[in-house]
């Protein structure tokens, strides 16, 4: 069997505070078989510096590609990314998350062992600033009835 390839899709909009960390964590994935075909960042018409950050990072790795999402919504971004993806598999990630280096391998191993068509990891939110809203989101996403 030929080597599988993965297209990573990251929808984003106004994520200038987080996008570099997300992309950097993806670039640091343990990928011994070099299966990451491309990293598609689908931007929903950001009005901050998100697109500039992505464009700058794209100069360091030709797998990083910036796509436009004129509809702004995440569902539309995913549809755009899926249509443009060239990998055998799609990995959907969030723009304001940082992933552990073994995330790709763990997902790949779990999919192979289980035969599942869709796998993912546990979300462990970290509050970077002490805002009430951030604390509320953290409480909801870590409570057993919140997710």
Regions from the PLM with identified roles:
Residues 4-7, 38:
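Cell-envelope/extracellular polymer assembly enzymes that use nucleotide-activated donors
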Residues 17-20, 48-56, 102:
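Acidic helix N-cap motif at the loop->helix transition within catalytic regions
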Residues 24-35:
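Short, acidic, metal-binding catalytic loop of nucleotide-sugar glycosyltransferases
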Residues 25, 43-52, 94-97:
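A conserved acidic beta->alpha catalytic loop
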Residues 35-45, 67-70:
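Short beta-strand/loop segment that forms part of the nucleotide-sugar
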Residues 69-85, 106:
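Glycine-rich, basic loop-to-helix element that forms the pyrophosphate-binding segment
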Residues 90:
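Short aromatic/hydrophobic "clamp" motif used to bind/position activated sugar donors
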Residues 102-134:
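Conserved donor NDP-sugar-binding/catalytic core segment of glycosyltransferases
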């Amino acid at each position: 069997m030929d080597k599988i390839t993965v297209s990573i899709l990251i929808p984003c909009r106004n994520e200038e505070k987080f996008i570099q960390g997300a992309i950097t964590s993806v670039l640091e994935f343990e990928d011994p078989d070099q299966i990451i075909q491309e990293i598609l960042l689908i931007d929903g018409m950001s009005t901050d510096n998100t697109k500039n950050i992505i464009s700058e990072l794209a100069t360091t790795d030709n797998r990083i590609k910036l796509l436009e999402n004129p509809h702004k919504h995440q569902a539309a971004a995913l549809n755009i990314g899926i249509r443009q993806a060239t990998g055998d598999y799609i990995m959907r990630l969030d723009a304001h998350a940082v992933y552990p280096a073994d995330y790709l391998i763990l997902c790949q191993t779990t999919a192979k062992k289980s035969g599942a068509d869709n796998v993912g990891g546990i979300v462990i939110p970290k509050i970077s600033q002490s805002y009430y809203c951030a604390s509320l989101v953290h409480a909801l996403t870590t409570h057993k009835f919140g997710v």
